[in-house]
Curated annotation (Swiss-Prot):
InterPro entries recorded: aa-tRNA-synth_II/BPL/LPL, Ala-tRNA-lgiase_IIc, Ala-tRNA-ligase_IIc_anticod-bd, Ala-tRNA-synth_IIc_core, Ala-tRNA-synth_IIc_N, Ala-tRNA_ligase, Ala_tRNA_ligase_euk/bac, DHHA1_dom
Gene Ontology biological process terms in this record: alanyl-tRNA aminoacylation; negative regulation of DNA-templated transcription
Protein's recorded name: Alanine--tRNA ligase
Encoding gene, per UniProt annotation: alaS
GO MF entries: alanine-tRNA ligase activity; aminoacyl-tRNA deacylase activity; ATP binding; tRNA binding; zinc ion binding
Length: 890
């Protein structure tokens, strides 16, 4: 391989090498794992091949090569806290991998590694700098490395079970508690004696001298929940080499952040922030985080308060805080997207395609956090006053930063870490308990059935042609996650058939319902899902007993099938109408299709107006009224895309796909195009008229840049329209007008109410002014400072602020606390003259008072406000306030 060794060149060289070894290049899968509920994010190259390794998803190739996008932030695999503090931790990284599915095994796998690393045609790394590790009992791997490759035995290190359990070893790889696993061999590069660190397996192994660059897993087993190791259908190979690490070696540097890719991003960050790039930790954080954030957004993740969206929010806010640390006083992080696209957009075109979406999403989140960042940092600074290296910040303070200022706890920990201070996490967790359901919970993902379901042949779906089938075979039964020979009356379980008319949940459509009958029992199917190549029927035995290997009759509930098909077809028409009205930037983000309702989530950065909703609804119903036949064809995916069929980004498709065409044709760019053409494996109507009618029932925002439309069809739409008509008639009757006059009458009433509210506000201000006239008589002097504390009846927060402005002009160098008492609520406000804020702060007064009253509040040193519910002890708390203020002033 010729110089220079750019990261992009190394990525391409890896792919080219394995193509020359008859490997099929496979595109990186989405960072959102497909059909794998055990993973928060894709974190290894083998994730997309998991079911292939299990023998449940055959492919038309047995060798593959990939450059896989990976994220390790949140969940079990989490490197977020270390980014910026080490030379090699990242939230996002690229994993170069080659895979064998029952093809070659250890001999060829090891040989390919050595050839690519050391051959003059490829990387030409000095062989004397390479060490390898193997699993302690893997004599076969030892012989290949020593006898065939020629590595001296002293550079081959055996690693046993060093993690406290059988098969718990650095050289026995597992994907999780269950799933594919096996012994592995790892290649290490020696950076030289001038770098601290020891060989793998020694106490000094965590140093930077010997760095792992390639891990080759010999996939032989499928670990069960009870720890049993079952042989995989065919021994396979799964390898991974971090692009960032191998780039550091090829570019002659010791740390990943010194390679071309990161240097360019750090230079861009320094230019945006108008500082010099001196390899500051904060620049490393920004360069790393823009990669994770941009790729996550491109793959459909949006900031939120739970799950993947909360991890994204944490990463963005951590980057923003580090920019603030470097002097950023305005939004900056979104400006890093363009340099990233320039650096990685060729290898990953989705970055270029989604650039504006990524920038807008980041900028909105950045602007939202900016509103509270400065306040939160001030609060944290005050909490850290007096704490020293080794001390502990209270969990209560960390929770307040999270709850009030939007600081994820790991962001607070990141800041305190710089001063050697830790957080009382146990106390923080206690405060979080009340909000646990809304907060991030990386452990919320379900048990993975792919590690449980074991069938010899994939289930054949026959439901496109029929609703029922006699003479199907029960291939397997499961109860409580374990294989069963039979299920008896009242038992819940899972049934796997050799053939089934039941549609399994997919493409947004829910799984079907119905019955499976045998000669000895009846199984009520309550849901249908996929697990690898098996279709699994969830339900309960309602009569008798069913057994494995029995012959059965399977029947889908026809009314549910028909209603679901109408809603699914309507969803396609809705998608096309949205793109026509709102523009081609609209992309599907999710959907739910049941027999009762359809729900469609899509990317759009503002609410859809009522006029747009009406136009979208009208377009869909025009297509329904046209009553054109739907057309379903199977074709190669390349041909489908060429015809204009829309594919969902991140969805996994085979070489042959099912294409659904609906609606009347129109001419687009000189080419005849149908109203809707999409890839879809779901169930649909035969003609658009079968849908009947569509009625949009709601439109709302569910996350930054994501909108949701809900709608109903057929009789459910008729019912919705009739209910609306009835409500309108009742409203007209109450208002004593005709139905067409309801809107005008409501507008007139609203105008009148606004006028009355303004009159009431003016009256309240007069009452407040009348009460305030004598307030100066209540002033007392404490420690030489004029102090006024007064409660005003019938006065709200807005009037309190107006009064405060008036009184503080008449009472300089003072402390003023006003409490408005109206409608069982207390409005709190405090003003402290700037000349006095070195002795007492308004924010402290309000925090104390609100806390004692059971409310919330805070603010600046000179002005703060809050609120609290009125209670029986409110008067006593307020009466005690002068003494508290006096104590602070003394």
């Amino acid at each position: 391989m010729s110089q220079p060794f750019r990261s992009a060149d190394i990525r391409q060289a890896f792919i080219d090498f394995f193509i020359s070894k008859q490997h099929t290049p496979v595109a990186s899968s989405s960072l959102i794992p497909h059909n794998d509920p055990t993973l928060l994010f894709t974190n290894a190259g083998m994730n997309q091949f998991k079911e292939t390794f299990l023998g449940m998803e055959p492919r038309d190739y047995t060798r593959a090569v990939t450059s896989q996008k990976c994220v390790r932030a949140g969940g079990k695999h989490n490197d977020l806290d270390n980014v910026g503090y080490t030379a090699r931790h990242h939230t996002f990284f690229e994993m170069l991998g080659n895979f064998s599915f029952g093809d070659y095994f250890k001999q060829a796998g090891i040989g390919y590694i050595w050839e690519f690393l050391t051959s003059d045609e490829w990387l030409a790394i000095d062989k004397n700098r390479l060490y390898v590790t193997i699993y302690e009992t893997d004599d076969e791997a030892f012989d290949i490395w020593h006898k065939d490759i020629g590595i001296p035995s002293e550079r081959i290190i055996r690693i046993g079970d060093n993690k406290g359990a059988p098969y718990a070893s650095d050289n026995f790889w597992t994907m999780g508690d269950t799933g594919p696993c096996g012994p592995c061999t790892e290649v290490f590069y020696d950076h030289g004696a001038d770098i601290e660190g020891g060989l793998p397996g020694t106490p000094e192994e965590d140093g930077d001298r010997y760095i792992e660059i390639w891990n080759c897993v010999f996939m032989q087993f499928n670990r069960q929940k009870d720890g049993t190791m079952l042989p995989l259908p065919a021994p396979s190979v799964d390898t991974g080499m971090g692009l960032e690490r191998i780039s550091a070696i090829m570019q002659g540097v010791h740390g990943n952040y010194e390679i071309d890719l990161f240097v360019h991003l750090m230079d861009a960050a320094a230019e945006i922030l108008e500082i010099e790039n001196q390899q500051q930790s904060s620049l490393k954080v920004i360069a790393d985080h823009i990669r994770a954030v941009s790729f996550l957004i491109a793959d459909g993740v949006t900031p939120s308060n739970e799950g993947r969206g909360y991890v994204l929010r944490r990463v963005i806010r951590r980057a923003v805080r580090h920019g603030n640390k470097l002097g950023a006083d305005s939004d900056f992080f979104y400006k890093m997207v363009a340099p990233l696209v320039a650096e990685m957009g060729i290898a990953y075109p989705e970055l270029k395609d989604k650039q504006s979406v990524i920038e807008n999403t980041i900028q909105k989140e950045e602007a939202q956090f900016a509103k509270t960042l400065a306040q939160g940092l001030r609060l944290l600074a005050s909490e850290l006053e007096g704490l020293q290296d080794g001390d502990t910040l209270s969990g209560e303070a960390a929770f307040k930063l999270y709850d009030t200022y939007g600081f994820p706890v790991d962001l607070t920990a990141d800041i305190t870490r710089e001063r050697g201070i830790v957080i009382d996490e146990a106390e923080f967790d206690e405060h979080m308990q009340a909000q646990r359901e809304r907060a991030r919970d990386a452990g919320k993902f379900d048990v993975d059935y792919s590690s449980v379901i074991q069938v010899e042949n994939p289930t054949t779906f026959i439901g496109y042609e029929q609703l029922e089938q006699e003479g199907v075979a029960i291939d397997a039964l499961y109860q409580d996650g374990n294989p069963a020979d039979s299920l008896t009356e009242g038992m819940e379980g899972v049934v796997v058939l050799d053939r089934t008319p039941f549609y399994a949940e997919g493409g947004g459509q829910v799984g079907e319902l119905g019955e499976i009958r045998t000669a000895t029992g009846v199984f009520d199917v309550q849901d249908t899902k996929k697990s690898g190549q098996a279709i699994i029927h969830y339900g309960v035995v309602t009569m008798g007993e069913i057994k494995t290997k029995q012959t059965a009759d399977a029947q889908v509930l026809s009314s549910i099938r028909a209603a679901s098909a109408k809603n699914h077809s309507a969803t396609h028409l809705l998608h096309a109408a949205l793109r026509e009205v709102l523009g081609d930037a609209v992309t599907q983000k999710g959907s739910l299709v049941s027999s009762e309702v359809l729900r469609f989530d899509f990317s759009y950065d503002k609410p859809v107006s009522p006029a747009e909703i009406m136009r979208i609804e009208r377009l869909v119903n025009e297509q329904i009224q046209a009553n054109t036949p739907t057309r379903i064809e199977n074709m190669p995916i390349d041909e489908a895309i060429k015809q204009g069929a829309m594919a969902l980004f991140g969805e996994k498709y085979g070489n042959d796909v099912r294409v659904l065409t609906m609606g009347t044709d129109s001419i687009v760019d000189g080419q005849r195009m149908p109203f809707s053409i999409e890839l879809c494996g779901g169930l649909h109507v035969q003609r658009t008229g079968d849908i009947g009618v569509l009625k949009i029932t709601s439109e709302s925002g569910i996350a930054a840049g994501i909108r949701r439309i809900e709608a109903v069809t057929a009789m459910n739409a008729i019912k919705n329209i009739q209910q609306s008509e009835q409500q309108l008639s009742e409203l007209a009757s109450q208002l004593k007008v005709k139905r067409p006059e309801v809107a005008q009458r409501v507008r007139t009433m609203a105008d009148k109410q606004r006028d009355l509210e303004k009159q009431l506000e003016r009256l309240e201000q007069k009452i407040a002014s009348a009460q305030a006239a004598n307030l100066l008589d209540e002033v007392q002097t404490i420690a030489g400072i004029p102090l006024l504390i007064s409660t005003l009846s019938g006065v709200d927060g807005k009037s309190i602020r107006t009064l405060m402005d008036d009184i503080k002009s008449k009472l300089p160098d003072s402390v003023i606390v006003l409490i408005g008492d109206k409608d069982e609520q207390l409005a709190l406000a405090a003003n402290v003259a700037k000349s006095v804020t070195d002795r007492i702060k308004a924010g402290d007064i309000i925090r104390y008072l609100a806390g004692e009253l059971g409310g919330k509040g805070g603010g600046k040193p000179d002005y703060a406000q809050g609120g609290a519910p009125k209670s029986n002890n409110s008067a006593a708390v307020i009466a005690a306030l002068p003494a508290w203020v006096a104590a602070q002033l003394s």
